[in-house]
Amino acid sequence: MPAKNHDMDPNSHMDNDSRVWEEMISGREYDATHPYLLEKLNATKDRIWEYNKLRPSMLKERNELLRELLGQSDEDTFINQPFYCDYGCNICVGRRFFANFNFTVLDEAPVTVGNDCFIGPNVSIYTACHSTDPVERNSRREWAKPVTIGDNVWIGGSVTILPGVTIGSNVTIGAGSVVVKDIPDGCVAVGNPCRVVKFLEKE
């Protein structure tokens, strides 16, 4: 668990808001029940609710709302409904990004995805971490680790990607895998825990 923060100034409300946000996205321990974070969570949930209620044929409106929600996306970003995330602004996706139904991202830390990536249905990306000690866990103190995915990656259906993982470029992750550690470039990886089973031949 990251070191605790004891230097917050209780007399500065706006400073506390900025500080708890910076603590969260930078991997330091933070208070998950801080009012500022809860306010941002609920605002994002309202926007996600709006997105998921749009008709599938309303492609322009869907894309416009995604570009408002996400930290970075493009006119060719496509995410099937329903889609779920915590903050949205910590998610950055590259060109020609596609995600299928029930894509879930807990983006307490940055989630960065490269170009030409395909996400299968029921894929989950987690950045939030909790203590295994029940007393510490019940304090609602958390920390987060970023997830990074390279270019030309295919994530199969029902894959779970855990906090702090980096997946290289030109990678296929087999359906149902649980990715608990980094995956190198140019390979096929499957299983729980996810392991490399084949490297692609270099031309």
Regions from the language model: what does each represent?
Residues 167-182:
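C-terminal/domain-terminus segments
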Residues 83-93, 98-166, 192-203:
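Flexible, glycine/small-residue-enriched loop-and-beta-strand segment within the central core
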